[in-house]
UniProtKB/Swiss-Prot annotation:
Mg(2+) binds at T70. It catalyses: ATP + H2O = ADP + phosphate + H(+). This is Holliday junction branch migration complex subunit RuvB. Belongs to the RuvB family. One of its GO terms (cellular component) is Holliday junction resolvase complex. InterPro entries: AAA+_ATPase (IPR003593), AAA_lid_4 (IPR041445), DNA_helicase_Holl-junc_RuvB (IPR004605), P-loop_NTPase (IPR027417), RuvB-like_N (IPR008824), RuvB_C (IPR008823), WH-like_DNA-bd_sf (IPR036388), WH_DNA-bd_sf (IPR036390). Keywords: ATP-binding, Cytoplasm, DNA damage, DNA recombination, DNA repair, DNA-binding, Hydrolase, Nucleotide-binding. The keyword Magnesium does not apply. The RuvA-RuvB-RuvC complex processes Holliday junction (HJ) DNA during genetic recombination and DNA repair, while the RuvA-RuvB complex plays an important role in the rescue of blocked DNA replication forks via replication fork reversal (RFR). RuvA specifically binds to HJ cruciform DNA, conferring on it an open structure. The RuvB hexamer acts as an ATP-dependent pump, pulling dsDNA into and through the RuvAB complex. RuvB forms 2 homohexamers on either side of HJ DNA bound by 1 or 2 RuvA tetramers; 4 subunits per hexamer contact DNA at a time.
Length: 351
């Protein structure tokens, strides 16, 4: 599978997505579509802090890629009228890296730490103290003679984002005063997002075309906007520039995004699960090897949607295909096929 095919319906941001995403991002909570419960709760947290004249509690947002966590972090800073500093867990390899960031924060600044679950453990321990006491302990010297020198830092608000909340240590998770879980979006919400994006991009998007794109966007705004741009390309080159239903269907068929929003990787996973493993159960690593992908790629890119859409069940014994998967792939299950009746297990566990 080519990188282009995989990236089209992947919730992860491609390099060329960032400039367009920046132009399409809502700037205020009122402009933000969807996540109504989170928006209402967040509005209360921010407004009450402003009325008290204090920094709001630290905020943790969890949910899949492409659901708006980074956008909300930017909106939080804008609503507070505060500067925003952006970094990520993988960039914090040592406690010194975190100390360098924290020591240069200005009072009231918002620090957005993406993929916070991937931060190095020594940095996590430093962050505990910084979040509670606005202090970092800088180690001077080495070995038994090393001394910790406390360094006061300016009060700040940490906004953490994670796609794997279960990987966060409890001491870190408990230090966030507000925890928000980002849900997948309804087709109706995605249609509103698509129409807004089309206006900003100067695209003539018909209602039925918007509904078709939304239905195949896996509940994820990032994917919806990406598909919108590919349908626009198709309409520009092979049509009259208008995004009609026929144009949307033809473009999405060309890019191998089917009626349920499945792409080539999704169908490869289902095909292997059904044909090679008779519907399962099968472990993640074995399933990933069978489609020539890394386990993390299958787990992060394909599996969340396949589980949510009802094609795969995660059971204590492994991944199991559902009757819906057999029907979608046009196959007949064997008489002894398992259908994932067992209780689902924690998404961060590996059978």
């Amino acid at each position: 599978m080519s990188e282009h095919d995989r990236e089209l319906v992947s919730p992860e941001a491609a390099l060329d997505d960032h400039a367009v995403e920046s132009a399409l991002r809502p700037r205020t909570l009122d402009e933000f579509v969807g996540q109504d419960r989170v928006r209402e709760q967040l509005s209360l947290v921010l407004r009450s802090a402003q009325q008290r004249g204090t920094a709001p509690d630290h905020i943790l947002m969890s949910g899949g890629p492409g659901l708006g966590k980074t956008t909300l972090a930017m909106i939080i800073a804008a609503e507070l009228g505060a500067p925003l500093r952006i970094t990520s867990g993988p960039a914090i390899e040592r406690s010194g890296d975190l100390a360098a960031v924290l020591s240069t924060l200005r009072e009231g600044e918002v620090l957005f730490l993406d993929e916070i679950h991937r931060m190095a453990r020594p940095a996590e321990e430093m962050l505990y103290v910084a979040m509670e006491d606005f202090r970092v302990d800088v180690m001077v010297g080495k070995g038994p003679g090393a001394t910790a020198i406390p360094l006061e830092i300016a009060p700040f608000t940490l906004v953490g984002a994670t796609t794997r909340a279960g990987m966060l240590p409890a001491p870190l998770r408990d230090r966030f005063g507000f925890v928000a879980h980002m849900d997948f979006y309804s087709p109706e919400e995605l249609e509103l997002i698509l129409h807004r994006s089309a206006r900003l991009l100067g695209i003539e998007l018909l209602d039925d075309a918007a509904a078709e794109i939304a239905r195949r966007s896996r509940g994820t705004p990032r994917i919806a906007n990406r598909l919108l741009r590919r349908v626009r390309d198709y309409a520009q080159v092979r049509g009259d520039g208008r995004l009609t239903l026929e144009c949307a269907r033809a473009a999405l068929s060309l890019y191998e995004v089917d009626d349920e929003g499945l792409d080539r990787l999704d169908r490869a996973v289902l095909d292997a699960l059904l044909r090679r493993f008779r519907g399962g159960p099968v472990g993640l690593s074995t399933l990933a090897v069978s489609v020539g992908e890394e386990p993390e790629t299958v787990e992060i890119v394909a599996e969340p949607f396949l589980v949510r859409a009802g094609f795969i069940a995660r059971t204590p014994r492994g991944r199991v295909a559902t009757p819906q998967a057999w029907a979608h792939m046009g196959l007949t299950p064997p008489p002894d096929a398992a259908f994932g009746a067992a209780a689902l297990f924690d998404p961060d566990e590996e059978p």
